[in-house]
A protein has these predicted regions:
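HDAC/HDAC-like amidohydrolase catalytic core signature
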Residues: 1-218
């Protein structure tokens, strides 16, 4: 990713060079390549298997937050809008941690719907992502947090996806659905307390059927 592509999503303090490594550029660049291929009709969907992760990186970047310096999904959204005319975007974050950076960046944007399924912020970093955080005054109801209790497994996640997330996406009618695809709600993750299985994640992804997925934590 170039400085200009990064600057469309972030303000880096004191500058981009101080906050961004080649690994960050490669991760964002890989996701941008995938997004271009999708937008140009070369692929029906795709998964950017990139690291470092990004969903804790906020608009203002002044250091690492939860292993994140650049918000890959935000860089992708800015690129899709500028290069491909995409307007309405849905980001569904299934990482076990709340994507506080993604929420921060799009909180006042009525054309980006951000939905997060995550372990209750009272029990896990970053301590945010509550149901009352619904978007700014000009973008009310464009941010939906679904905090889940520790111990939630396949049944709980799939119920929320089918009964809440999918109907909301249907009503919003996005041009593109992006999955912030954290894998750390898996029962083996040492930093969280959820009980999702590999089969549960597979079914979750099958139901969501995102156009683009970007690897996050786990």
């Amino acid at each position: 990713a170039t400085d200009l592509e990064i600057a469309r999503a972030h303000i880096c303090v004191p500058n981009i060079a101080a906050q961004v490594t080649e690994a960050h550029r490669a991760a964002c660049g890989g996701a941008l390549t995938l997004a271009d291929a999708w937008a140009e009709g070369q692929i029906a969907n795709g998964f950017a298997l990139v690291r470092p992760p990004g969903h804790h990186a906020m608009r203002m970047v002044h250091g690492n937050r939860g292993f994140c310096n650049l918000n890959t999904e935000a860089v992708v959204v800015a690129h899709l809008r500028r290069q491909h005319g995409i307007q309405r975007v849905a980001i569904v974050d299934t990482d076990v941690h709340h994507g506080d950076g993604t929420q921060d960046i799009f909180y006042h944007d009525p054309n980006v719907l951000v939905i997060g399924l995550h372990q209750d912020g009272r029990t896990l970093y970053p301590g945010t992502g509550f149901i009352g955080e619904l978007g700014g005054p000009g973008a009310f109801a464009s941010n939906l947090n679904i905090p889940l209790p520790p111990g939630t497994g396949d049944e709980g996640y799939l119920y929320v996806m089918e009964e809440l997330v999918l109907p909301i996406l249907e009503a919003f009618q996005p041009d593109v659905v992006i999955n912030s695809a954290g894998q750390d709600a898996h029962y083996s993750d040492p930093l969280a307390r959820m009980q999702v299985s590999a089969q549960g994640y597979a079914r979750l992804t099958q139901l969501l059927a995102p156009d683009l997925a970007v690897l996050e934590g786990g």
